[in-house]
From Swiss-Prot:
Record HAMAP family: RecO
Record protein name field: DNA repair protein RecO
GO CC, alphabetical: bacterial nucleoid
Organism annotation: Lactococcus lactis subsp. cremoris (strain MG1363)
InterPro entries per record: ARFGAP/RecO, DNA_rep/recomb_RecO_N, NA-bd_OB-fold, RecO, RecO_C
Assigned keywords, A-Z: DNA damage, DNA recombination, DNA repair
Keyword check for DNA repair: yes
Ranges in a coiled coil: none
One GO BP: DNA recombination
One Pfam family from the record: RecO_C
Length: 251
């Protein structure tokens, strides 16, 4: 055990015994840790340990079991995420992806920062689907998946249009479409946007407008990539998928 200070982002909490809770926090300095909070309802930190909160932790870090919180300060609450069911669903999904992408206790300050920035953008009103797509694509390499959407897999031509081949795990230019008769037959703009999303920094992201039809094509393609190369099935993703028709109903 060791005492330490670190930034931490609450991923989720669950009941433990009658009055206690386990709170999973993605810390900047020590990776994802499970913290035991006794008598959670009476804890002075209860409001600071809700989902979608980030703060500075003073804690006892234990590599072999539960860690313990001594103090929480400088708390940031993502209020818009908590208040809007649609933003909440996207935020819950990317949190689940981050949780699945690395092992517990694994030091990964870059992923912590990427997740935090993604949640900030969602809370600020940036396009939910775009932020989620960017997160999905840029976290792929942590699942051991490296895909190049910027050039043809055969001739390395970098000017589109391109289509995607699962057979070759890469893009094909028109000259090489015949190499895979079962290529994806994508709208060329899908590959263009996928490549953009894979490379862009969230700090450079501007508010952009993408038509619903194109978003649906991108969603279908990314789902295909995850089915083929990652193979995880998250409850938060299933819930998000089930919300597709809610917007019209709730108008």
């Amino acid at each position: 055990m060791r005492d330490a200070e670190t930034q931490g982002l609450v991923l989720y909490s669950r009941n433990y015994k009658e009055k206690d809770k386990l709170v999973k926090i993605f810390t900047e300095s020590f990776g994802k840790r499970m913290f035991f909070v006794k008598n959670f309802g009476k804890s002075p930190y209860a409001s600071s340990l809700q989902a979608f909160t980030d703060g500075k932790l003073t804690a006892t870090i234990n590599d072999g079991g539960f860690s313990f919180i001594e103090d929480v300060s400088e708390v940031v609450v993502y209020k818009n995420i908590s208040a809007d069911i649609f933003i909440n669903a996207h935020a819950s999904y990317i949190i689940s992806l981050a949780d699945a992408a690395i092992s517990d206790n694994q030091y990964d300050p870059a992923l912590y920062g990427f997740l935090k920035r993604s949640l900030e953008l969602l809370d600020q009103g940036f396009d939910m689907e775009v932020v989620t797509n960017i997160f999905e694509l840029q976290v792929l390499h942590r699942f051991g998946v490296s895909l190049n959407f910027s050039e043809c897999a055969f001739c390395h031509k970098t000017v589109g249009p391109f289509d995607f081949s699962y057979k070759f795990s890469g893009c094909l230019c028109p000259r090489h479409f015949d190499e895979d008769l079962r290529r994806s037959h994508l709208d060329p703009n899908v590959i263009y946007l996928i490549n953009l999303f894979q490379e862009i920094s969230l700090d450079e992201l501007k508010k952009i407008s993408i038509k619903a039809e194109m978003k649906a094509k991108i969603r279908q393609f990314i789902d295909g990539l995850y089915d083929e190369y990652v193979g995880i099935h998250l409850k938060s993703k299933k819930f998000l998928d089930g919300m597709s028709g809610w917007a019209d109903i709730m108008k």
